[in-house]
Amino acid sequence: MPFQLLQTDGHARLGRLICNQGIVDTPAFMPVGTYGSIKTLTAKEVEASGTQIILSNTFHLWLRPGLDIIKLHGSLHKFMSWNGPIITDSGGFQVFSLSKTRTITRKGVGFKSPIDGHLVFLTPEKSIEIQHDLQSDIVMIFDECISYPNTWDYVKKSVNISLNWAERSRLRFDTLHNSNMLFAIIQGGMYENLRDMSAKELINIGFDGYAIGGLSVGEPKKEMYRILSHICKLIPTNKPRYLMGAGKPEDLLEAVQKGIDMFDCVIPTRNARNGYLFVSDGTIKIRNAQYKKDTSPLDGNCDCYTCQHYSRSYLHHLDCCKEILGVRLNTIHNLRYYQRLMEELRQAIKTKSLQNFIDIFYKRVNRI
């Protein structure tokens, strides 16, 4: 089995995901490398953070540099010198993020290229073929990521189209004799009955894992957690569960507690570029004047390169001067913070002390 469930603590799960390019310990956080890189970091620096798997984007790599360039190197892994597993988004998120320039039909989605404005058309089959050429360890089906809010009628129509695309994705994946994994994406907006319909049909088709899409798109937190609790009960226990796009530390804790195994999000890297840094007691804005003369490390509990070698004062200086080194050091730290958090969550599940860990976490981060 590609997924091994090793231990539970309530609904939380400790597991291992066995990919062609390596093993991923779950719960796992996957940093986002849209264009084949985690912004500002080398592959070795990403690996040093404790990252075991990264996410890249089918749609954007298809447009630039193009499959012909990546295939010259043999695979996306070799192109970016990453030795671990890679999961690729199918392009479904671009159906959401490029909504002003796209047209949805049952056949697929037409887009205006964000690079030069020329028209491109992406079908479920084409998305699977691109991911096959990239040699993604985990391939995602093509779907529509539904915006919030939306009407029940629109969401039902969208779910039906996505289910059609799921069947076509499954068929094309199988005809390519792909040895990697294929994950489905459960949609349905904030409507439990439509989530039920989506999950039931996808489970009937059969996939290696099940992602939860259409969350963290602007809905209230209580709505996200409500839908998350509902869906986790629907997914077979022997399959990995992947929450797409949600990534604040408290979201990770709540979702792990509900039974989620995998996460991706741009928050740690994007926040790092904007000078917002995660520390044991919460978050800090490193540009604030209070850090100008602060000679202490960014986080005394952190073992990352940044915290072992530089002070808050120096990071404050780099941020004020807009030095690229500051962005790199911030990113190294934030990514390590997230991977340390996942390591601590896995250890808490292993020792059946997750609730105690979460209680301590919330008490600690409220100090700032």
From Swiss-Prot:
Positions that bind substrate: D89, S90, G91, G92, F93, D143, Q187, G214
Record keywords: Glycosyltransferase, Metal-binding, Queuosine biosynthesis, Transferase, tRNA processing, Zinc
Record-linked Pfam families: TGT
Region (RNA binding): 269-273
Keyword Transmembrane helix part of the UniProt annotation: no
Cofactor note: Binds 1 zinc ion per subunit.
Root EC class: transferase
Free-text function comment from the UniProt entry: Catalyzes the base-exchange of a guanine (G) residue with the queuine precursor 7-aminomethyl-7-deazaguanine (PreQ1) at position 34 (anticodon wobble position) in tRNAs with GU(N) anticodons (tRNA-Asp, -Asn, -His and -Tyr). Catalysis occurs through a double-displacement mechanism. The nucleophile active site attacks the C1' of nucleotide 34 to detach the guanine base from the RNA, forming a covalent enzyme-RNA intermediate. The proton acceptor active site deprotonates the incoming PreQ1, allowing a nucleophilic attack on the C1' of the ribose to form the product.
HAMAP family: Q_tRNA_Tgt
Entry similarity comment: Belongs to the queuine tRNA-ribosyltransferase family.
Protein name from the UniProt record: Queuine tRNA-ribosyltransferase
Organism: Blochmanniella pennsylvanica (strain BPEN)
Lineage, uppermost ranks: Bacteria, Pseudomonadati, Pseudomonadota, Gammaproteobacteria, Enterobacterales
Encoding gene (name): tgt
